[in-house]
């Protein structure tokens, strides 16, 4: 782990500890000190090789780890086979919804990474977007705003300052115009409740759109990995590691939400923004069976709620408030007036 990584871990851990009651701080796992060899270390610029940085991902299988992805042999296409989903013990949330988790071992600071996975059948659920702003027009959405009727909630898209980035349609009305970017994708829910994707340029005036948002970068487009995620010299930072959040769909239409959490310091410090690279997250989404997927705002913004019927609500909170969120209701629940 490099000196900047240790400093980032310590800074975020202090923020997290500040949100924990004093009586429970003693129960937190202790943070290792910065190795002497790294104290005062200076990061020097280096020439980027054209290929991906060497890394691997392994999944826990009982008491052992099985490597299932290596950067030097990264596939350029995923077929929709959900090999990682085979390792998940699924818990029902509502008809057509389930969630579970897997443990990954990766390179560097991702040596212990938990992945929370949610599956949603859009035919048996209602999807809607939600926003929240203060009187000063600062972004203000967090898990505390999730309506009781919603079974799943997750922050949506990316944001610039206090507004969502790119195209936003709320209940049939355009809230923000489309953004432009070679790796942008639009997640669209039409008036019939169907989910569809628009990768690349988006037209502002579209009939039949109930809810929509844009995000970036595109991870998968009809099974293909975005070419910019296969090289280190294509304009995307393929070295940076962070807590990741992504949304995608399988060929049968199943919606998949995946969030990574730092798994080395216990659940209470899971929001520490250490985790996977963008190419690694693309691989995770491919191995979960998706053929279309996009990254959402991760890091300290990432937040996810799952409300099981008759069981306490599971919350994976973020530190930063966001301007936009996706809510998922059972098909019988109302989505308006939230």
State the predicted function of each range:
Residues 132-138, 201-206, 259-265:
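Short, solvent-exposed aromatic-acidic interface loops
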Residues 163-181, 233-338:
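Conserved, well-ordered active-site substructure
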Residues 138-142, 205-210, 266-274:
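A short, polar/proline- and glycine-enriched secondary-structure boundary/capping micro-motif
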């Amino acid at each position: 782990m490099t000196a900047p990584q240790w400093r980032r871990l310590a800074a975020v851990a202090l923020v997290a500890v500040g949100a924990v009651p004093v009586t429970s701080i003693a129960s937190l796992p202790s943070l290792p000190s910065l190795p002497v060899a790294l104290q005062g270390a200076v990061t020097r610029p280096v020439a980027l090789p054209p290929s991906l940085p060497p890394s691997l991902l392994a999944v826990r299988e009982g008491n052992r780890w099985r490597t299932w992805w290596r950067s030097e042999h990264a596939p350029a296409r995923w077929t929709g086979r959900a090999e990682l989903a085979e390792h998940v013990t699924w818990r029902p949330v509502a008809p057509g919804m389930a969630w579970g988790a897997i443990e990954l071992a990766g390179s560097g600071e991702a040596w212990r990474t938990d992945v929370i996975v949610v599956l949603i059948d859009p035919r048996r659920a209602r999807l809607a977007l939600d926003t929240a702003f203060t009187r000063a027009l600062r972004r203000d959405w967090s898990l505390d705003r999730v309506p009781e009727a919603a079974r799943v909630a997750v922050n949506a898209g990316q944001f610039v300052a206090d507004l969502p980035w790119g195209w936003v349609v709320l209940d049939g009305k355009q809230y923000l115009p489309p953004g432009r970017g070679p790796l942008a994708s639009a997640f669209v829910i039409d008036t019939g409740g169907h989910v569809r994707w628009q990768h690349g340029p988006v037209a502002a005036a579209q009939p039949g759109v109930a809810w929509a948002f844009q995000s970036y970068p595109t991870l998968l487009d009809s099974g293909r990995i975005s070419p910019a995620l296969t090289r280190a010299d294509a304009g995307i930072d393929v070295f940076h590691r962070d807590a990741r959040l992504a949304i995608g769909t399988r060929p049968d239409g199943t919606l998949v939400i995946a969030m990574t959490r730092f798994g080395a310091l216990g659940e209470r410090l899971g929001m520490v923004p250490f985790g996977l690279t963008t190419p690694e997250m693309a691989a995770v989404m491919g191995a979960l069976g998706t053929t279309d997927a996009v990254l959402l705002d991760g890091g300290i913004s990432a937040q996810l709620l799952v409300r099981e019927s008759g069981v306490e609500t599971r919350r994976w909170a973020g530190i930063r408030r966001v301007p936009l969120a996706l809510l998922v209701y059972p098909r019988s629940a109302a989505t308006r007036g939230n």
